From Swiss-Prot:
S-adenosyl-L-methionine binds at residues 35, 39, 46, 73, 94, 122-123, 138. Belongs to the class I-like SAM-binding methyltransferase superfamily. TPMT family. Keywords: Methyltransferase, Phosphoprotein, S-adenosyl-L-methionine, Transferase. It comes from Brassica oleracea. Disulfide bonds: none annotated. Its EC number is 2.1.1.n4. This is Probable thiocyanate methyltransferase 2. The modification Phosphoserine is found at residue 85. GO terms for biological process: methylation. S-adenosyl-L-methionine-dependent methyltransferase. Probably involved in glucosinolate metabolism and defense against phytopathogens. Highly reactive to thiocyanate (NCS(-)) derived from myrosinase-mediated hydrolysis of glucosinolates upon tissue damage. Also accepts halid ions as substrates. It holds the Pfam family TPMT.
Amino acid sequence: MAEVQQNSGNSNGENIIPPEDVAKFLPKTVDEGGWEKCWEDGVTPWDQGRATPLVVHLVESSSLPLGRGLVPGCGGGHDVVAMASPERYVVGLDISESALEKAAETYGSSPKAKYFTFVKEDFFTWRPNELFDLIFDYVVFCAIEPETRPAWAKAMYELLKPDGELITLMYPITDHDGGPPYKVAVSTYEDVLVPVGFKAVSIEENPYSIATRKGKEKLARWKKIN
C-alpha cells in the first residue's frame, strides 16, 4: 500500500492552480532566486501536498519495476515515499535544500524511512556509483528551459540501467506561452528521447489526473533500445 502524506491545502488536488495560470507568475520568483526561493517563500503551486494519484495507482497495481528508483525534482518527497518499499529503494533528488528539509521533516519518521533517501544534487551533473532500474519524471522536463531538454534526455539515458524503465508523466500538454511550467507535447519528448536511444513502449492518457490537470497529461513508458 502506498504511503500518502496529505496537507490541508491540497489534500485532494482541487486547489492546485492550472499550469497556464502558474506560468503567469512563477517565472518571477524563479528569476529572482531560483527553485530554492520558491521553496523558501512557499511558492510551490505544483506541489499537490500528497503523492501523485497516478503513482499511487502504479504502486498499488504492482506496475512499477523493482530495484533502484529515482525521482528527480522530488520536492516535498511525496512520490519518493509512495514508491519506496523493501523491494524498491528510491532516491529523491532536488537542487533545493529547503525542499529536501521539508521532505525530511514530513517523512523522516516514516516506517518506510530505510527504503528511501533524499539527495541534494544537480540532476544534469550528478552521476552516482549505481544506476537505476526506474526513473520517474513529472516536473523536471516542464520546468527547464526548452533548449535544455536534450541534456535532460542524455542524463536520463546515463542514469538508467540498460534494462531499466523511464516513466514520464507528460505535463502540461497545453498551448500557453512562457513558463515554467513550459508547455509540452508528445513530440517534444520524442524529439529528445528517441535520438539518445529510447523507445516509447506505451503512451496513454492519465485517468488519475487531478481536476485542474485533466486532459493535460499523458503517461509514457520508455525503454532503452541501444
